[in-house]
Amino acid sequence: MIVFDRLWQTMKHKNISTYQLRERCGIDSKTIRRLRANDNIETKTLNKLCTALHCGIDEIMEFVDDTAE
């Protein structure tokens, strides 16, 4: 499963609020809710996030194996 915990850590480290992120990326509150819920996100949204935060994809998301026995 893909999780976005690193996004919130990166935002905190860079002192960027959710509102500022929305303004920089041009994303809506629905997209923020989807990120918080680790729901599907379009690749162009991921691109906007990386561009706005000046970071790599590994700083906003990670793969967590949820098939552990």
Language-model features, listed with the residues they occupy:
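Amphipathic, hydrophobic secondary-structure cores in small proteins
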Residues: 31-40, 47
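A short, Lys/Arg-rich alpha-helix, primarily the initiator
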Residues: 1-20
